[in-house]
Amino acid sequence: MYLKNISLRGFKSFANKSNMVFEPGISVIVGPNGSGKSNIVDAISWVLGEQSPKTLRGSSMVDVIFKSKKEELAIAEVSLTFDNKDNALPLEFNEVKFTRRVYSRGGSDYFINSSPCRLSDMIDVISEGGIGKGLYTIVSQGQINNIAILKPEERKQIIVEIIGISKHKNRRNKSKNNLEKA
């Protein structure tokens, strides 16, 4: 599984629809200061379930909607399309698209492959694939410094989370408990 495409419209500095296509492997987003690199990372975090406006560098969720002195949009929308040919996500599609919208009047909509869903449904599917806001999918510069100064055992725990071992341990423990009850 890999992120194949990001589509942004009305999100922070991206007033007009913008598409970014990625290939398998490591992708790097580069550009001069103020060109929107951090906003791309914020957009990814937002679709993956980020609920804290502060984490997205705002005071409320509507702050992600494009606003300038000349123009103010009523909606922000971001879609992340993942290649799912390896079935890492628990859906039987070769591509899975997650979309999140927020409206200036308040309220949000969420979609998986253009079908309406709840945020919790989207987060569940994303987490099953081993990605998500709490899973070190996105590591910022400040987090790298913090990880580097951790005690070895704390650092090991983070690595275990990153590679997905904790998810399997939790499933194993749940299965053990179910067997003991039976």
Predicted features, each with a name:
Residues 2-182:
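Gly/Lys-enriched N-terminal cap/neck module of very large, oligomeric protein machines
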